[in-house]
């Protein structure tokens, strides 16, 4: 989230933002601003930068881990990009009740991929948790997972996880709006666990790991592993899911926080990226944009490939329904792949629910 404005404007704006965040955090630290304690255990997964850290795949992994233990998790998200306001029930743990335009693309993806999880969107995480307590009083979830909540200090958490993208030079970064930092790096001291994501395993990984270890917080490392390629001939038809076949010539498109990581993942699977189109994170697609992508793919005999998040975003846009009926497109499923610290993560997650 950096802005294309002169440095003479951005630098003072970043300094002002930094001071506002510093004052706000100090008010919480001194308990002038009060933190609410939920009767249900809370796990927060957030970041210290604006988008593209690999947070959503980690949220998905944690939800699936709790489900594998026989737990009933609830996911609380802001629902970025949604056209609704207030507290909304996305899934009751049995049925997904909303499309992505009403709850946000990432939230819709999490709900559909974890049908047994309760999913709520709300601007204020506390409002969402109190809604869960009232709405599911007779069958409470075992744990609530706050998506993107590191900066939301109004609600206390039992475990605070911060995800950091190795590819972002955070230790030389500026605050929003000049840079991508949401708050100063010193505030990583609030976290219980740091996850260094999208690692390459080279000298960059080692250097950033050393920097993070200076915080005194445990650090685990994870790359992004490609799953299957889901291809649809007409995006409302039954999906065909299969392993990625090397040699596919693709037109890749995405509207995510870190699109180059998507390209790197595709190329790592042997997919040849002949052309690509990037859009802003959470940007709505239009019929004109989709038609242009299809025309280019047809002319160059390329396969349209996008992210799972973009797929769900398109499905939720009413104005795209007609063109999507005939659009052939594939999306790549991804997951975190831990290279160091998976056992520690599970131990800390278990402790939250007294396992």
Curated annotation (Swiss-Prot):
One of its GO terms (biological process) is lipid A biosynthetic process. The keyword Magnesium does not apply. InterPro entries: LpxK, P-loop_NTPase. GO terms for cellular component: plasma membrane. One of its GO terms (molecular function) is tetraacyldisaccharide 4'-kinase activity. It holds the Pfam family LpxK. It catalyses: a lipid A disaccharide + ATP = a lipid IVA + ADP + H(+). Pathway: Glycolipid biosynthesis; lipid IV(A) biosynthesis; lipid IV(A) from (3R)-3-hydroxytetradecanoyl-[acyl-carrier-protein] and UDP-N-acetyl-alpha-D-glucosamine: step 6/6. Its EC number is 2.7.1.130. The keyword Repeat does not apply. Coiled coil: none annotated. Keywords: ATP-binding, Kinase, Lipid A biosynthesis, Lipid biosynthesis, Lipid metabolism, Nucleotide-binding, Transferase. ATP binds at residues 49-56. HAMAP family: LpxK (MF_00409). Transfers the gamma-phosphate of ATP to the 4'-position of a tetraacyldisaccharide 1-phosphate intermediate (termed DS-1-P) to form tetraacyldisaccharide 1,4'-bis-phosphate (lipid IVA). Belongs to the LpxK family. This is Tetraacyldisaccharide 4'-kinase. It comes from Chlorobium phaeobacteroides (strain DSM 266 / SMG 266 / 2430). The gene is lpxK.
């Amino acid at each position: 989230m950096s802005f294309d404005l002169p440095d003479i404007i951005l630098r003072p704006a970043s300094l002002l933002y930094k001071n506002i965040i510093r004052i706000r955090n100090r008010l919480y630290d001194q308990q002038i601003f009060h933190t609410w304690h939920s009767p249900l255990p809370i796990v927060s997964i957030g970041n210290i930068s604006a988008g593209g850290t690999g947070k959503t795949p980690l949220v998905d992994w944690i939800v699936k881990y709790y489900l594998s233990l026989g737990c009933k998790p609830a996911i609380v998200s802001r629902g970025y990009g949604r056209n609704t306001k207030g507290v909304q029930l996305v899934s009751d743990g049995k049925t997904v009740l909303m499309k992505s335009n009403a709850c946000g693309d990432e939230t819709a993806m999490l709900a559909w991929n974890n049908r047994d999880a309760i999913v709520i969107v709300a601007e204020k995480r506390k409002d969402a948790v109190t809604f869960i307590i009232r709405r599911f009083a007779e069958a409470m979830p075992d744990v609530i997972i706050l998506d993107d909540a590191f900066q939301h200090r109004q609600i206390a958490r039992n475990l605070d996880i911060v995800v950091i993208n190795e590819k972002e030079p955070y230790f030389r970064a500026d605050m929003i709006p000049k840079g991508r930092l949401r708050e100063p790096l010193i505030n990583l001291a609030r976290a219980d666990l740091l996850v260094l994501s999208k690692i390459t395993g080279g000298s960059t990984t080692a250097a950033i790991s050393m920097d993070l270890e200076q915080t005194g917080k445990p650090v685990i490392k994870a790359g992004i592993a490609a799953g299957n390629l889901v291809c649809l001939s007409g995006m409302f038809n039954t999906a065909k899911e299969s392993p990625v076949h090397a040699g596919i010539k693709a037109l890749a498109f995405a509207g995510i926080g870190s699109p180059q990581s998507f390209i790197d993942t595709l190329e790592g699977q042997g997919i040849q990226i002949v052309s690509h189109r990037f859009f802003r994170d959470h940007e709505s697609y239009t019929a004109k944009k989709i038609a242009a992508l299809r025309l280019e793919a047809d002319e160059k005999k390329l396969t349209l490939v996008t992210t799972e998040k973009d797929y769900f975003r398109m499905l939720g846009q009413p104005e795209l329904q007609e063109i999507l009926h005939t659009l052939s497109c594939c999306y790549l499923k991804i997951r975190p792949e831990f290279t160091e610290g998976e056992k520690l993560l599970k131990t800390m997650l278990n402790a939250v629910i007294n396992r």
